């Protein structure tokens, strides 16, 4: 069984960050070691929340505790998501180096959350620069959405072809795999939800139906990153990993819609996460 050190935000109520990714990754058969960058009452898109950002040193101290009991060598991957400060990010890269020293085969999967102010997702000053200048170079796998892809790539992306070009340019800086979690306005169709998985030599495109909500649930990207990582650690081929991730997230969205809920209904959808009823084919791009 694979072990994932998941360094992300945590909400007490609802699902975002570790609160969105931890249970689905466990349901997929991975051991998850959740390490929280922030602890908030709820996610920030409610407009009101309480809680705190963890000191950057807290992250390092906790991981050192794991090293002290000689278990860091069993860590197969570090997954990072929302960070509360650029200083936290620098400490996370130190943790990645420490994990890789203990297990050279360990992967670093970076979900470079840079904030979407118009949706209420705000990151601290310096976080975007940290991702562009540091985490991108250290990551084995990076999973931006479209605005994050544009920031990382330093260009505007208008269509699928340009998204592939930009993702492949990122591969030249460090990552072996780039997952574009949501093509949004660069998608080939307005009525579909589309993603890309890009390596230096290959690219796959996948689409599924959009599930419309009055208020779009939060944590979908965190869920997506976690599921893809588990699939990759299991040795699933890239295209099949993308297909399962897409179908599993779709199952969660359908159940959440059916239950008329704002928060992702992960427990109710757990069987669909492990064994999706729907299938979407990843198309290899020439």
Swiss-Prot record:
Alphabetized SUPFAM superfamilies for the sequence: Ribokinase-like
Cytoplasm recorded as keyword: no
EC class of the enzyme, as a word: transferase
GO cellular component: cytosol
Domain of life of the native organism: Bacteria
Pfam families, per database record: Phos_pyr_kin
Keywords: ATP-binding, Kinase, Magnesium, Nucleotide-binding, Transferase
Residues annotated to bind substrate: 9, 44-45, 222
InterPro entries for the chain: PM/HMP-P_kinase-1 (IPR013749), PyrdxlKinase (IPR004625), Pyridoxal_kinase_PdxY (IPR023685), Ribokinase-like (IPR029056)
Entry keyword annotation includes Translocase: no
GO biological process, any: pyridoxal 5'-phosphate salvage
One GO MF term: magnesium ion binding
UniProt cofactor(s): Mg(2+)
EC number of this enzyme: 2.7.1.35
Residues binding ATP: 111, 143, 148, 181, 208-211
Pathway connected to this protein: Cofactor metabolism; pyridoxal 5'-phosphate salvage; pyridoxal 5'-phosphate from pyridoxal: step 1/1
Reaction catalysed by this enzyme: pyridoxal + ATP = pyridoxal 5'-phosphate + ADP + H(+)
PANTHER family: PYRIDOXAL KINASE
UniProt record similarity statement: Belongs to the pyridoxine kinase family. PdxY subfamily.
HAMAP family per record: PdxY
Subunit field text: Homodimer.
Role according to the record: Pyridoxal kinase involved in the salvage pathway of pyridoxal 5'-phosphate (PLP). Catalyzes the phosphorylation of pyridoxal to PLP.
Protein name as annotated: Pyridoxal kinase PdxY
Organism: Pectobacterium atrosepticum (strain SCRI 1043 / ATCC BAA-672) (Erwinia carotovora subsp. atroseptica)
Organism classification: Bacteria, Pseudomonadati, Pseudomonadota, Gammaproteobacteria, Enterobacterales
Gene it is expressed from: pdxY
